[in-house]
Amino acid sequence: MANHNAEIEEIRKRQRAQGPANILAIGTATPSNCVYQADYPDYYFRITNSEHMSDLKLKFKRMCEKSMIRKRYMHITEEYLKENPNVCAYEAPSLDARQDLVVVEVPRLGKEAAAKAIKEWGHPKSKITHLIFCTTSGVDMPGADYQLTKLLGLRPSVKRFMMYQQGCFAGGTVLRLAKDLAENNTGARVLVVCSEITAVTFRGPSDSHLDSLVGQALFGDGAAAVIVGSDPDLSVERPLFQLISAAQTILPDSDGAIDGHLREVGLTFHLLKDVPGLISKNIEKSLKEAFGPIGISDWNSLFWIAHPGGPAILDQVELKLGLKEEKMRATRQVLSDYGNMSSACVLFILDEMRKKSIEEGKATTGDGLDWGVLFGFGPGLTVETVVLHSVPATITH
């Protein structure tokens, strides 16, 4: 028996990587249809036949002006909405029309982002051992993970994980899962794809549901992909960030703060409580738990990647923690250029940060700093906290 224990221990040792997980490449993609926030209220109320609701339109205009979003990308075009008028109503049976679109387009947009990440990574796609696919839309069987495997031509033996309808915190969830897979399977290379298309949540305005209108002012489409692995082969691979630790928590007294329900009318979105207040009130606890063991308590010494659920969340977190304005620069840039793309946002922000750090000649991929934090916020209220370590910035990234 003792002999077997030694053998098992040896097998376990061989199965595990030596070092921490690294993000080895990042790719992003958006649909070609770009909508400018300044023009959106007129378009939205016209296409949904709601121009008679002039007071509501004024409220929506103010929401769009306060959103800090300049433009967004959306797969659904005016042509699609004219062909599917039920999607434009606030509550009309429209799930089939929505599903038919997202089941095809979510994997397709994901493929575009994944292909860019694979190209940057530098290894053949046959070396991908695991796939994590995440989307808030389009439950189907076989899932978007299967469709992407086929579209990309990955090996049939790739180990797949499919995450549906987790919502806006899931960009942190996928990194947490990828870290565990990379560190516990020697040689593992995990392709992570978050692909989000708002066709499931788009709907016309309703006087009695202003929370739904908030979503219409914020949400955009986009896909992001990263490749995660431990013990990088430095002759080919160029690490961008190390994943040091990852945690998830449910905030106290936040039941029902953000809900989504899949119905015949599509995915309905409900914002029931003071979400920015709940997040800002609890965020320091998550920071202390994550950075206490490392001996860090100055939150301005970190580089920041925070899911931009909306400008009020970022404003209140900054205020509560006394963050300098530049801390959220990459986060606010992504919000301005793309809107809230749910799970994909934080991966877009990682991409923005490493690119800007190199362009501006910073010493590291993390805006010249060593340690950073990535936050996902979403339904629950659930918070994902990922501790990152940057690497020296070189032009080859």
UniProtKB/Swiss-Prot annotation:
Instruction: Name the catalysed reactions.
Output: (E)-4-coumaroyl-CoA + 3 malonyl-CoA + 3 H(+) = 2',4,4',6'-tetrahydroxychalcone + 3 CO2 + 4 CoA
Pathway membership, UniProt: Secondary metabolite biosynthesis; flavonoid biosynthesis
Q: Does the keyword Ligase apply?
A: no
User: What is the top-level taxon of the source organism?
Assistant: Eukaryota
Q: Hey, which family's this protein in?
A: Belongs to the thiolase-like superfamily. Chalcone/stilbene synthases family.
Q: What functional role does this protein have?
A: The primary product of this enzyme is 4,2',4',6'-tetrahydroxychalcone (also termed naringenin-chalcone or chalcone) which can under specific conditions spontaneously isomerize into naringenin.
The protein here is known as Chalcone synthase 2
